[in-house]
């Protein structure tokens, strides 16, 4: 039995909750039968490899959060800028870069649309990527695009810093 959770959720919002209830029962029964949790471990491994591919290309360590469910990863450009080039650069990014610029940039370069990291309508340079839907190479491409964005911003920052001296 294969069913895409998004289709199940769509059916649920259309008022057809019985299919969702049946699917959840099947998931629960499968989990009880898989006493070694091998399926869950395999899925977690795939998701974590995707996350690692993104951050490896970005050039920073994968954030460690013991409470994370790892379904999404949140890339905060302010924190990433700080890790890559220091506090002064991160402050400059917050004052001078359009918060949505990185979302459009990644979409243009990779064909992948990321969601705003801090919620819709919040002006903060961050992005949220689902780790459930793409192939590992696509997450690496996202990381590469974000790193390129940071490098270009750093060159702008250095140029602006020289002018101000």
Where do the language-model regions lie?
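PLP-dependent class I/II
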Residues: 1-165
């Amino acid at each position: 039995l294969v069913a895409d959770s998004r289709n199940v959720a769509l059916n649920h919002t259309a008022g057809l909750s019985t299919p969702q209830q049946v699917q959840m029962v099947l998931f629960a029964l499968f989990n009880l039968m898989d006493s070694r949790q091998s399926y869950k471990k395999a899925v977690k491994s795939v998701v974590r490899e995707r996350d690692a591919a993104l951050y490896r290309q970005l050039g920073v360590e994968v954030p460690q959060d013991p409470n994370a469910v790892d379904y999404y990863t949140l890339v905060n450009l302010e924190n990433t800028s700080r890790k890559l080039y220091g506090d002064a650069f991160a402050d400059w990014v917050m004052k001078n870069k359009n918060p949505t610029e990185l979302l459009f940039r990644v979409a243009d370069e990779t064909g992948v649309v990321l969601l705003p990291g801090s919620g819709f309508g919040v002006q903060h340079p961050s992005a949220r990527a689902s780790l459930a839907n793409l192939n590992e190479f696509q997450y690496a491409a996202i990381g590469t695009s974000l790193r390129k964005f940071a490098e270009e911003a750093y060159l702008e920052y250095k140029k602006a810093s020289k002018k101000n001296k």
